[in-house]
């Protein structure tokens, strides 16, 4: 099982490191200096767009730390950066013995324009309501909750498309060597395992500050 830790614990570790060392790490991306604790993946292409930062969260619906980060940590970042931050989740299973139903539901909802809503509903159902989502009746409740038609949703779910999208995301995570969830990828090639909001804010601010020198 991949190791995981909550962002609150990471925050304490991050602040201690910053106090001792000034900045945990710096790197050059183009001409812009990035600050914080991160790894630039040289084999991956940057997807950066001026004035925007793309945040990809590799997460397991059954991971409690992923649930906490998605509900608390991500909210802090969205409040800090507003429409300058584009966040999306990629399903990456690390908890053994779980069927891929939750991930397939998320992928199908994305194709119908309700990915973020379904993500929140699935996380809540698993971690707060403590209800499994294998049963079709439970799925129908969630599908209606996010404003989708159950018949159309189930038809799409039965096709190969959601499963393929989930598998493509898993392969992406394997390629960039995800070791724990949640792990964040910024702008396609900046990998962040220390996912406390303070470290992520430091990195994202430095990306945005460097836009004037980016080619």
Residue ranges and their predicted role:
Residues 80-111, 116-143:
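Structural microenvironment flanking redox-active thiols in thiol-disulfide oxidoreductases
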Residues 3-5, 30, 60, 144-215:
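C-terminal cap of thioredoxin/glutaredoxin-like
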Residues 51-52, 66-70, 95-102, 111-115, ...:
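Solvent-exposed, acidic/flexible segments
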